[in-house]
UniProtKB/Swiss-Prot annotation:
The gene is grpE. It comes from Prochlorococcus marinus (strain MIT 9211). InterPro entries: GrpE, GrpE_coiled_coil, GrpE_head. SUPFAM superfamilies: Coiled-coil domain of nucleotide exchange factor GrpE, Head domain of nucleotide exchange factor GrpE. Its main location: cytoplasm. This is Protein GrpE.
Amino acid sequence: MNDEASTPIQEDLKEESAVDLAQEAKPTSDEPSLSNVAEGSQEAGAETDVTSSDAKDSSSQALDNEARLEQLEREHETLNSQYMRIAADFDNFRKRQSRDQDDLRLQLQCNTLSSILPVVDNFDRARQQLNPEGEEAQALHKSYQGLYKQLVDVLKQLGVAPMRVVGQTFDPSLHEAVLREPSDELAEDIIVEELQRGYHLNGRVLRHALVKVSMGPGPKDDGEETITEQSLEGDNTTDQQSSEKSD
């Protein structure tokens, strides 16, 4: 009877012991399991790999950016050099174009004025030759002189100025020698006479002056040399006779 009564109690004790043993065998939440440790190690390794990969990517990106920057700087220097060269060429072209336009304008002006100068020459010759007599002729001559003066004033306003050449030394850049003659009064290459007036246009030669130039003193004639020699011989003979008489 005692054996049958104790059997349920023993079974309960056995069950409680089994439960306790199971609880003791079960790991607590505070103690990490081997699997958790392994998983953590794997995650840490993965994070380390990611960090290392990011660092490599950042370093590679920095090198690429630096290389790209150097390339852009070289391209900038090349383009800037090309721009400066093009700007200099354009400035030279602009200056050359302006100079060519000025030269063309001056050439057209010279051609126009050169065609007017013969008219001025005719006015000047007529003014010097006319000697009017009577009131009507003098009135006509006065009107003619006024017209000539008006023409000269217009030329002066355009920058035309006459040359003054008589008594000056001959200069082939200004004068054109048409005649040459000996002169006892003037040295060689001195302008004796103006045959056609020359003109300047704003400091440049518009038309050369046609002139007569001195050749300087000419050679002595043979007759004059003979007379001079004879007179010298006569003087010497007279001196000798005078000295003999005195002796």
